[in-house]
């Protein structure tokens, strides 16, 4: 049974699943789908072309499916898709995609967005990911699975953050953050592997050892990234994790965030 508060405005064209609850003063427009057992708290606005999965919880003041903040947007149909078991805390905003990408802004399953997170047009956020308070994604940002981003962190348009990475709070991300790594500071630097996260996710000691060696070669000792890639391919076994790391760095368009120790050496040389 669907429960809709008398003060809520819900279009009779919207598709609401079993046991959906809609709180006071919330507005749900025509072209909206909401899965079973999802809870929409008070004063939420869900606009056209939005699809929300099952067992989600959307807290007070969220606005989902608003048009993108993109000067090239001409009113074309585009979408927001949110997976199952995902939580958006107070005052999150999620904008629709644009024709400059695939037209979809997507948030995965089992993902947790804390208060005041902003997800801009065409972003992709993976499964089991946590974005802390006031994380701000510019357009076309891609964040993988099992990622944690600390609060008050802005992420530049088109940047990527790979699976199992961790970004410290109040960082400024203007380069790609490879999978399995730990990054922080303004502007963002790499600080080794996300060892705590990898152990929590059950990665073996052998896998972590290989990733440490790949990290050392790619980001600390090789004169260039291209030389580091070649050395890793020649010296290390082609495990799934090593291949994931190589695929990520090979396809960077924004560039990879600098390694902290290299950055310190560069500053010393300049001084």
From Swiss-Prot:
Keyword set includes Transferase: yes
Annotated compartments: Cytoplasm
GO biological process, alphabetically ordered: lipid A biosynthetic process
GO cellular component, one term: cytoplasm
GO molecular function, one term: acyl-[acyl-carrier-protein]-UDP-N-acetylglucosamine O-acyltransferase activity
InterPro entries: Acetyltransf_C, Acetyltransf_C_sf, Hexapep, Hexapep_transf_CS, Lipid_A_LpxA, Trimer_LpxA-like_sf
Pathway: Glycolipid biosynthesis; lipid IV(A) biosynthesis; lipid IV(A) from (3R)-3-hydroxytetradecanoyl-[acyl-carrier-protein] and UDP-N-acetyl-alpha-D-glucosamine: step 1/6
Main subcellular location of this protein, as a coarse class: cytoplasm
Entry keywords, A to Z: Acyltransferase, Cytoplasm, Lipid A biosynthesis, Lipid biosynthesis, Lipid metabolism, Repeat, Transferase
Subunit structure: Homotrimer.
HAMAP family: LpxA
Entry similarity comment: Belongs to the transferase hexapeptide repeat family. LpxA subfamily.
Entry function: Involved in the biosynthesis of lipid A, a phosphorylated glycolipid that anchors the lipopolysaccharide to the outer membrane of the cell.
Name this polypeptide is given: Acyl-[acyl-carrier-protein]--UDP-N-acetylglucosamine O-acyltransferase
Originating organism: Sulfurihydrogenibium sp. (strain YO3AOP1)
């Amino acid at each position: 049974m669907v429960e809709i508060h008398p003060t809520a405005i819900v279009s009779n064209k919207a598709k609401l699943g079993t046991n959906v609850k809609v709180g006071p003063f919330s507005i749900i427009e025509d072209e909206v789908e909401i899965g079973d057992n999802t809870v929409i708290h008070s004063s939420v606005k869900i606009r056209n072309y939005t699809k929300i999965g099952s067992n989600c919880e959307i807290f007070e003041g969220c606005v989902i499916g608003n048009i993108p903040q993109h000067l090239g947007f001409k009113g074309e149909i585009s979408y927001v898709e949110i997976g199952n078991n995902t939580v958006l805390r107070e005052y999150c905003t999620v904008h629709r995609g644009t024709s400059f990408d695939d037209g979809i802004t997507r948030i995965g399953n089992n993902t947790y967005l804390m208060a005041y997170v902003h997800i801009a047009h065409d972003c992709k956020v993976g499964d089991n990911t946590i974005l802390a308070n006031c994380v701000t994604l510019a357009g076309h940002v891609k964040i993988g699975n099992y990622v944690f981003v600390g609060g008050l962190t802005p992420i530049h348009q088109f940047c990527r953050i790979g699976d199992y990475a961790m970004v410290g709070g109040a960082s400024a991300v203007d380069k790609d953050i490879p999978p399995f790594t730990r990054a922080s500071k303004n502007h963002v630097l790499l600080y080794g592997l996300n060892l705590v996260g990898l152990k929590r996710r059950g990665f073996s000691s052998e896998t972590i050892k290989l990733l440490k060696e790949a990290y050392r070669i790619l980001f600390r000792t090789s004169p260039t990234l291209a030389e580091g890639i070649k050395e890793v391919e020649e010296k290390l076994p082609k495990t799934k994790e090593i291949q994931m790391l190589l695929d990520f760095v090979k396809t960077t368009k924004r560039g990879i965030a600098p390694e902290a120790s290299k950055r310190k050496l560069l500053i010393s040389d300049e001084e």
